[in-house]
């Protein structure tokens, strides 16, 4: 590689970019809404009751379908099950993308697959983290569309569905009227607020439209492993907020609880567990119970209903150590494992290099000889192939 003089290129007009930016903002401008539960039932729910009663798996799969319909249509059969959400950033792992898409399709249909934790397994830099990041960014954008409109109880740290307000004795009639089944339960926080602020009149409870945002901890939660000796399950489920206990006087009051755990941030969306097999066993059982039963149990409170999709990823070394312990067999049965290996296509490997080079500003003045990326990709692929067992064959044949 040698430094060369940059090519003289005509700069695109800035006014054109500003116009495109304004158009993008206009297209993605979502209408905020705030009202009572009575107004929600009268003005919002009748538009499409099924859409407003979606589970997290259904919501995520609808987002994937929205990307497939709203963006480029590919003729390549390898991409038939993948969506435009992935195809511009992930190369050479189409089988893994297909399996992930199929997982969400089956889970959205209500099959038992949705009661299993999705585990992405593969070597470092294989695309696992990038896949989860794209899913989170896709959810954020989808929630700003009309199709992805999401409504929650105003002020709830769990941004729970307004439909959870419907009493159990009335849910049968609700199903007959609107054609949807309610499975969620009101959280202790919202239940206490309903009693204290509204004297039990749930029709007056405020409802608002919310937008999924990792930065705002709405619909996206992330947990990264800590030192096992210092890791605290409070990072997942929260703990007593001692600063509030002094004013409230009761540690069992939901208002005295810190609802900052990752599982609460992920409610109605997705929880990413980074290097999940490095966490304590009690963490794993809590997550698997959450996946299967949609509930978590914390001290001083009854079961807390949470509807979220858990996506975990880990590397091969940690997974092999996990397999060696027999007591982990029951945990494996509750996981859907999707392998995300390195690509074995030199063309896809070269596309990865081209993407990395084009995104680095330092390479804009660097000349690359023709096919140099393809050549580097070939050598990289050869290091990933097993030695042939048949005599007379080598890795170049």
Where are the predicted features?
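Long, basic/Gly/Ser/Thr-rich N-terminal segments
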Residues: 3-56
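Conserved ASCE/P-loop NTPase catalytic core
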Residues: 42-397
């Amino acid at each position: 590689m040698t430094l060369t003089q940059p090519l003289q290129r005509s700069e695109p007009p800035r006014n054109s970019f500003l116009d495109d930016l304004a158009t993008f903002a206009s297209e993605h401008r979502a209408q905020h809404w705030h009202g009572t539960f009575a107004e929600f039932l009268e003005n919002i729910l009748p538009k499409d009751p099924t859409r407003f009663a979606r589970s997290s798996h259904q919501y995520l799969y609808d987002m994937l379908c929205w990307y497939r319909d709203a963006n480029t249509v590919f003729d390549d059969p390898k991409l038939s099950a993948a969506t435009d959400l992935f195809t511009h950033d992930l190369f050479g792992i189409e089988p893994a993308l297909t399996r992930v898409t199929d997982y969400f399709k089956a889970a959205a249909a209500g099959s038992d697959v949705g009661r299993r934790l999705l585990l992405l397994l593969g070597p470092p830099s294989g695309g696992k983290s990038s896949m989860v990041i794209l899913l989170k960014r896709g959810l954020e954008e989808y929630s700003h569309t009309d199709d992805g409109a999401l409504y929650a109880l105003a002020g709830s740290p769990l941004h729970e569905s307004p439909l959870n307000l419907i009493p159990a004795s009335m849910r049968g009639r609700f199903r007959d009227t609107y054609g949807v089944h309610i499975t969620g339960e009101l959280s202790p926080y919202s239940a206490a607020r309903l009693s204290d602020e509204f004297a039990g009149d749930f029709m007056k409870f405020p409802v608002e439209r919310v937008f999924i945002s990792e930065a705002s901890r709405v619909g996206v939660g992330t947990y990264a492993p800590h030192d096992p000796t210092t890791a605290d399950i409070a990072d997942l489920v929260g703990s007593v907020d001692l600063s509030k206990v002094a004013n409230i006087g009761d540690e069992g009051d939901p208002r005295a609880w810190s609802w900052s755990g990752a599982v609460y941030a992920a409610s109605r969306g997705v929880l990413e567990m980074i290097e999940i097999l490095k966490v304590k066993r009690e963490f794993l059982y809590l997550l698997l119970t959450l996946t299967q039963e949609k509930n978590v149990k914390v001290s001083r409170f009854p079961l807390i209903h949470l509807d979220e999709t858990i996506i975990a990823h880990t590397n091969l070394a940690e997974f092999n150590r996990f397999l060696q312990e027999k007591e982990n067999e029951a945990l494996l049965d509750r996981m859907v494992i999707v392998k995300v290996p390195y690509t074995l296509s030199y063309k896809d490997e070269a596309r990865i290099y081209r993407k990395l080079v084009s995104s680095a500003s330092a390479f804009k003045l660097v000349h690359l000889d023709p096919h140099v990326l393809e050549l580097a990709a070939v050598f990289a692929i050869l290091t990933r192939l097993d030695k042939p067992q048949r005599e007379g064959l080598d890795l170049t044949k």
